[in-house]
């Protein structure tokens, strides 16, 4: 475990079997150590893991816990190549403003809570811009915290490309809470 208390272990096979790769800091390319990744154990911290090297491709946020198969972290396949430890603020404050149009236009909603469905909670189809006022958040392209994930830190996002998306298809979001 690192000085910051972060550690993640990747396993080639399901249920923590086969070759493994231990990591306690950011790693831009570990696919040379493992040909595939079918299970993960996060022993400290919250991690962002990426499908491709250099923190690219699909991203998954993993808090401390066991993930015996890639479906448990909503993975699309057994390919992971890079990871980074998230350094979350310990203040415990969370606040986000979401907007129905780009550049902070249109109807605005502010919340401090997770949202499993923006359609049900805010009667919005998509999020075109947002302001993260406190905490770190994850946007999901589908309801109930499913689909592609986007990590949002404390700052303003004028359009979907600012948070790494190609479209405003965000259907749910949640706070990243350190366990």
From Swiss-Prot:
<dbReference type="GO" id="GO:0002088">
    <property type="term" value="P:lens development in camera-type eye"/>
</dbReference>
<dbReference type="GO" id="GO:0005212">
    <property type="term" value="F:structural constituent of eye lens"/>
</dbReference>
<feature type="region of interest" description="Connecting peptide">
    <location>
        <begin position="88"/>
        <end position="93"/>
    </location>
</feature>
<keyword id="KW-0007">Acetylation</keyword>
<keyword id="KW-0677">Repeat</keyword>
<feature type="domain" description="Beta/gamma crystallin 'Greek key' 2">
    <location>
        <begin position="45"/>
        <end position="87"/>
    </location>
</feature>
<comment type="function">
    <text>Crystallins are the dominant structural components of the vertebrate eye lens.</text>
</comment>
<dbReference type="InterPro" id="IPR001064">
    <property type="entry name" value="Beta/gamma_crystallin"/>
</dbReference>
<feature type="region of interest" description="N-terminal arm">
    <location>
        <begin position="2"/>
        <end position="5"/>
    </location>
</feature>
<dbReference type="Pfam" id="PF00030">
    <property type="entry name" value="Crystall"/>
</dbReference>
<keyword id="KW-0273">Eye lens protein</keyword>
<dbReference type="InterPro" id="IPR011024">
    <property type="entry name" value="G_crystallin-like"/>
</dbReference>
<feature type="domain" description="Beta/gamma crystallin 'Greek key' 1">
    <location>
        <begin position="6"/>
        <end position="44"/>
    </location>
</feature>
<dbReference type="InterPro" id="IPR050252">
    <property type="entry name" value="Beta/Gamma-Crystallin"/>
</dbReference>
<comment type="similarity">
    <text>Belongs to the beta/gamma-crystallin family.</text>
</comment>
<feature type="modified residue" description="N-acetylserine">
    <location>
        <position position="2"/>
    </location>
</feature>
<protein>
    <recommendedName>
        <fullName>Gamma-crystallin S</fullName>
    </recommendedName>
</protein>
<comment type="subunit">
    <text>Monomer.</text>
</comment>
<feature type="domain" description="Beta/gamma crystallin 'Greek key' 3">
    <location>
        <begin position="94"/>
        <end position="134"/>
    </location>
</feature>
<dbReference type="GO" id="GO:0007601">
    <property type="term" value="P:visual perception"/>
</dbReference>
<feature type="domain" description="Beta/gamma crystallin 'Greek key' 4">
    <location>
        <begin position="135"/>
        <end position="177"/>
    </location>
</feature>
């Amino acid at each position: 475990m690192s000085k910051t208390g972060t550690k993640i272990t990747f396993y080639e096979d399901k249920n923590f079997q086969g070759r493994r790769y231990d990591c306690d800091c950011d790693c831009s390319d570990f696919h040379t150590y493992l040909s595939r990744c079918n299970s993960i154990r996060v022993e400290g911290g919250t991690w962002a893991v990426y499908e491709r090297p250099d923190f690219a491709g699909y991203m998954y946020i993993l808090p401390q816990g066991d993930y015996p198969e890639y479906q448990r972290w909503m993975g699309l396949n057994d390919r992971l190549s890079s990871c980074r430890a998230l350094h979350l603020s310990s203040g415990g404050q969370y606040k986000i403003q979401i907007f129905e149009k780009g550049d902070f236009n249109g109807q605005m909603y502010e919340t401090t809570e997770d949202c499993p469905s923006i359609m049900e909670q805010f009667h919005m189809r998509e999020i075109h811009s947002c302001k993260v006022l406190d905490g770190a958040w994850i946007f999901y392209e589908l309801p109930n915290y499913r689909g592609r994930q986007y990590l949002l830190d404390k700052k303003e996002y004028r359009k979907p490309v600012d948070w790494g998306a190609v479209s405003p298809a965000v259907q749910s979001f949640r706070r990243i809470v350190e366990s």
